[in-house]
């Protein structure tokens, strides 16, 4: 099993897909990496030679910010926005959608489950 930047790549997937298991690498970037290293996107990760694994590892470490480094950078950016008190920071602090989505309805993922509020009592 090939191991790159702390992630075990799935053995039976094509390299184009297997690389997307690394945080920070999607389909497009995966294709770019394979083109730059000269590895076929159709090749399975179990069929990689040690030289190819080394080549991939060196390319990714030299040119991309992935996994732990990228996660830390994203968290630092969020913390910085919260500290400076910008609008996006306030939205993060309140646990609401940050990018202008509606909140009257929807936004349940960000806001969490509904909190039921007692309605008006019926008059008799």
UniProtKB/Swiss-Prot annotation:
Keyword hit for Cell inner membrane: no
Molecular functions (GO terms): rRNA binding; structural constituent of ribosome; tRNA binding
GO cellular component terms, A-Z: cytosol; small ribosomal subunit
Gene Ontology biological process terms in this record: translation
Keyword terms, alphabetized: Ribonucleoprotein, Ribosomal protein, RNA-binding, rRNA-binding, tRNA-binding
Keyword Ribonucleoprotein applies: yes
Region of interest (Disordered), ranges: 95-124
Classification via InterPro entries: Rbsml_uS13_C (IPR027437), Ribosomal_uS13 (IPR001892), Ribosomal_uS13-like_H2TH (IPR010979), Ribosomal_uS13_bac-type (IPR019980), Ribosomal_uS13_CS (IPR018269)
Complexes and interactors: Part of the 30S ribosomal subunit. Forms a loose heterodimer with protein S19. Forms two bridges to the 50S subunit in the 70S ribosome.
Task of the protein: Located at the top of the head of the 30S subunit, it contacts several helices of the 16S rRNA. In the 70S ribosome it contacts the 23S rRNA (bridge B1a) and protein L5 of the 50S subunit (bridge B1b), connecting the 2 subunits; these bridges are implicated in subunit movement. Contacts the tRNAs in the A and P-sites.
Family label: Belongs to the universal ribosomal protein uS13 family.
NCBIfam families named in the record: uS13_bact (TIGR03631)
Protein name as annotated: Small ribosomal subunit protein uS13
